[in-house]
Amino acid sequence: MSQVEAFSAAEVIAAKRDRHSLTDPQIDWVIDAYTRSAVADEQMSALLMAILLNGMESREISRWTDAMINSGERMNWSALTRPTVDKHSTGGVGDKITLPLAPLVAACGAAVPQLSGRGLGHTGGTLDKLESIPGWRASLSNEEMLKVLQDCGAVICAAGAGLAPADKKLYALRDVTATVEAIPLIASSIMSKKIAEGTSALVLDVKTGAGAFMSDPQKAKELAHVMVGLGKRAGVKTIALVTAMDIPLGLTAGNALEVRESVEVLAGGGPADVIELTVLLAREMLELVGITNVDPADMLKNGKAMDVWRQMISAQGGDPDAKLPTAKENLVITAPSSGTILSMDALKVGLAAWRLGAGRSRQGEAVQAGAGIQIHAKPGDVVAAGAALYTLHTDTPAAFARAQESLTNSVTIGDLPKDGKIDRLPLVVERITD
């Protein structure tokens, strides 16, 4: 016998179409009914578009998030003796920060249950990067996750199928219905998974600039405020940093390339911007869980963070000493003129890395572990005509032409302004606590 439904999809769609607030029972029902396929994709598509056009008030967003959490399981870390804290980034080009950050924060005394994702389009995915390490496993059971956390203090793995299943369905639908940009839907998608993950504290790294999902700083700040509010209402200590993604982070964009750079950072070296953001986020995470007597910068220098990295990779089946994959072919792109690099477009660099095979255009597509871009000079650097700007790496040489096309006009080279300043976003645009 079929279930008697509390509402009809049409009345919920009409309410939002006509700019009314959805009631808590309407929200609970529509998320549950969609998860069990009692609401069709066509109907949910119409509701998502109405939300995009007419928005949601904070109570609606909070209830929508709760309903998505309640569609699946909640993880429980009460068996751990350490406080739990996580970081979520909205993604960008060269954003490998999770790789050095999780072991660094664990080395300082917190537990970091980092449920990560795969890349899509020009933004890289943490799991794709780590899967370039021979033997490393992204899929762990809840019991395996707990064991790695107990033994190492940090785990980076894929979210299980039981975590916010409503979000998985909604995410796929938003992707094909031009409703990805709706801030209430972005915020609830991210926060439903993070709250269900069971962490007691969360630092959000909301990227802005050309290479970010939220390129407009005002929109990025709005998203950050909404997500911080959702976290706090759910009892999770939450803050957000809006950070720059106008130029790539570090000197690599790719999978194995970014793992190598992350290991350099854990060894006490690496690019200054990656070190700065990693340490900054580590301090924020530690402060949220009351660990203030350790300086994460010291843990990078003394090798403790590297020790945790090696343990964590080994615990997930990887070999921390294995040679990382390299691409079969490479091509150097040179500077067309002499001068100071005044700007670099992160989006163009990210698209080029994607075209070389470092990313995917559809969920489930394979990526090339060795593909990507090395960046030899960044804004503020002086270059001579003919000097190397980028080295492109791929297993498919036919991809070079399209990648080069993406990189056309990706840098501006000229004379430094009289005041000596380059017009770009500060690394941290804003810190948001409410």
Protein language model features and the residues they cover:
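Acidic, glycine/proline-rich low-complexity segments that act as flexible tails and inter-domain linkers
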Residues: 2-94, 311-315, 428-434
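Short beta-strand segments
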Residues: 115, 149, 157-160, 205-209, ...
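A glycine-rich helix N-cap at a beta->alpha junction
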Residues: 129-155, 225-231, 235
